[in-house]
Amino acid sequence: LDQAPKGILIWRAILQWLGGIGIIVIALIILPFLRIGGMQLFHLEGDDPYDKFLPKISSVVSKIFIVYIALTLILFFLYYLNGMSLFDSLAHSFTTISTGGFSTHNNSFAYFNNITILNIAIIFMIIGSLPFLILAQSNFSNVTSIIKDHQIQLFLLILILAISLIYFFAKNYIDG
């Protein structure tokens, strides 16, 4: 990767970013029509429930897209302010928020040798894993309501348990 052309690397990052938002949009648009998932909240009563559905879903998708772009921009600036080049900041912000984890270097984040950059990546990968519908509806104005959401609580519980198990088994493996 260190020798790969920058055009290829940024293209790969852009595709990862578009895939991240694309899967969210597809889930919001397609699944309700198939009556799959918890998206029945968009179902409005009437003769044809989908007459009013598309304007509402368009509004929700727009909000989610704004949140996705805002998080990407915040991440870009945080990476840049903590020592990444403009190119690396852009590419890594695309791949972090989409949780793809692609890097522009052979050693991935170890290349930067910067714990702050690594912590930023961890935080934003967790944020990128959260339900964007909830993030868009809250506008990040009420963090308490986000944390009180049952999906997010379960996700964070599973995350904490997984990290604890990995730590326990890795520690036992290393210690012998």
Predicted features and spans:
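Membrane-proximal intracellular helices of multi-pass ion channels
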Residues: L1-G176
